[in-house]
Amino acid sequence: KWMCTGGVNAKNVNNYLGYNQIIAVGGTWMCKSDKIKAGAWDEITAMSREAVDVMLGLELGHIGINCADEAEAAKTAETIANLLSMAVKVGNSSIFVGKKEFEIMKKPGRGTNGHIAILTNNVDRAIYHLGQRGVKFDMDSKNVKDGKTVAIYFADEIAGFAFHLV
């Protein structure tokens, strides 16, 4: 495994981290020497936090809506699709609306109201960094394929929604 430190910046950090051989990146783009000399720790912290946020690439994946049964799911999917002029794709356990922005569950799934999927560039790195921010994970929900974590749920709901990283 390698740690790259030369030529890395906010625009290309994820290109480096996309290689299995690269375990970490670093460099002066995250912590300028003049900031260290000046003791500008708040600025250094902000730059480092920005670097981590860029690396994680967290963004909304989809919203899952729990329905009581298949009939309610079909009606809900049709309503959302008609309202937003989106396509419907029926699956085994759910119905997707749009480009998978909405997942309408055919029976109640995780979360009181449903679930929210958060996309990330690397689930394992996101588990570590979000854990540092106080997020607890349901380790029993961890889904691993080819040695990499591909999904995991937060331990706690937020506003009646289960959250998971994918």
What would you call each of these model-derived segments?
Residues 9-12, 21-44:
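Glycine-rich phosphate-binding active-site loops on the catalytic face of alpha/beta enzymes
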Residues 64-103, 125-128, 132, 143-150:
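Core segments of cupin and vicinal oxygen chelate
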Residues 45, 100-106, 131-166:
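Vicinal oxygen chelate
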Residues 52-77, 111-118:
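N-terminal beta-strand motif that seeds the catalytic metal site of vicinal oxygen chelate
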